[in-house]
Amino acid sequence: MTKWKRANPNGTRDYLFEECTLIEEVEQKLRRTFLERGYEEIRTPTIEFYDVFAFQSRPIDEEKMYKFFDEKGRIIVLRPDMTIPLARVMGTQRCDTPLKVTYSGNVFRANESLAGKYNEIVQSGIEVIGIDNVRAEIECVISVIQSLQKLKVQSFTIEIGQVQLYKCIVKKLSIHEEEEKVLRTYIESKNYAALSNFIRDKKLDRCDETVKLLEKLPRLFGNLEVIEEAEKLASSNEMKMAITRVKEIYEAIEKLGYGSYISIDLGMIQHLDYYTGVIFKGYIYEIGEEIVSGGRYDELIGNFGEMLPAVGLAVQVNQIVKALQEQQEPYERKRIDIMIHYELNRLAEAERLRNLLQKDGKKVALSLFSNLNDTFQFARKNQIVTVVEAKSESLVEYVWKEKWVVQKEGETSCVTFKLR
C-alpha cells in the first residue's frame, strides 16, 4: 500500500523555492493590475458538486473531472474550470450589475497520460458580468495586455475570434452534432484537405456563399483585411453582426496603441461549448503554448438563475512563469542578508533586532543552531556574509573576510546597536 508514497500523481509536480516565489509574484502582479482597473475579488471553493458542471450542454467532459463522494454520498469534483463556479455565484447571489470581478486559483483536469499537460494548473482571470456591450470585451483585452506588459512578458499576441460566426454557418448548413464535432477539429487544426473532403462528402454546394465562407474559415487570420474578406461572404445579418463585433474590438484596441499585441482568427473555435460570441486566445511565441483564453458566454449564468450576459479571460499562470524563466536570467530568490545567532535567554533581544534591521529592507533570519560554529557553517553554505551574535551581555557583529572577523561589538539595546 506504500508503492506510490514517494511519487506525485500523473500531471502534477512540486514547485520549490525560486519557482514557487515566481508563481506567487506573477499572481500578485496580475491581481494588483486587475484591482487597479476596478475589478472586485471573488473566491469559490476548490471542491464543487458534480451537478454544477453537468448541465445540458456538458461543456467539460465527465472523464476530465476528478470525482469523489462526500460524507452523504453525493458526487463532488475538484473544480475543472473557474468560470462555471463563478457563473453559479452570479446566478444564485444578488449582485448589482454590471460587475467586474477577478479571481485566482487552482484548476484540476485529468488529461491523457504523456500528453505533456499538467492536471493541476493555476489560473488568474477577470470577468465582466451583466452587460452585452462591446466595451466589455475591450475592457477585458486591455486589462490582460496591460497585466502582461507589467509582467514584462515578451512577444505575446491575443487572437480575437468569433464562435457565433461558426455557429451560424453550422446552423445554416444543417450540420448535425456528431458531424459538427469532426468539422470543428478540422477548422481548429487548419486541416484544409480534411475540410475540403468534408464539404465534398456532405455534397455541399461550393458555389453557395456560406459554403465558401466555411471553406475559407481556417484561412481567415491576420489583420482587418480578414474582416473585409469575411464580410463579402456573410450571407445573413447575424453573420454580419458577428463579424462587425470583432472589427469594432480590433479597431478600438489598435487606436489605443496596442495593435501589435492583437490579431484576428475567425477560424478559432473554443473547445468549451458555453461560449456564444467573441472568443480569445493568447500565445507567447517562444513557448508556443496558450497563456490566455476566454470569451463571451451570455447563456451560461442562466443555468443557475437569472440570465446575464458575461465575458471573461483567464491567464495561465504556469505558462507565464515558464515563459519568464526562458526569456530572463535565471530567477534567484532573495538571500538572507543577516543571520542572528542568540542564546535562549536573549531571544527577545534577538527578535527586536531582527525587526529593526528588516525595516531597512534587509532579509534577516534567526539562526536555528545552538552552537555559533554551526551558524557560521550554515551562513557560509548559504552565502550569508553577516552574522550577529546576541550574547548574554552584548551584541557582536561578524563579517566574512576569508574568515569570520569581528566587525563591531556593542550594547545589548538594539536601539543603540547599529550595523554599517
UniProtKB/Swiss-Prot annotation:
Keywords for the protein's UniProt record, in alphabetical order: Amino-acid biosynthesis, Cytoplasm, Histidine biosynthesis
Annotated GO MF terms: catalytic activity, acting on a protein; histidine-tRNA ligase activity; transferase activity
InterPro entries in the record: aa-tRNA-synth_II, aa-tRNA-synth_II/BPL/LPL, HisRS-like_core, HisRS/HisZ, HisZ
Sequence similarity: Belongs to the class-II aminoacyl-tRNA synthetase family. HisZ subfamily.
Function recorded in the entry: Required for the first step of histidine biosynthesis. May allow the feedback regulation of ATP phosphoribosyltransferase activity by histidine.
Subunit (UniProt): Heteromultimer composed of HisG and HisZ subunits.
Stated name of the protein: ATP phosphoribosyltransferase regulatory subunit
Organism: Bacillus cereus (strain ZK / E33L)
Gene of this entry: hisZ
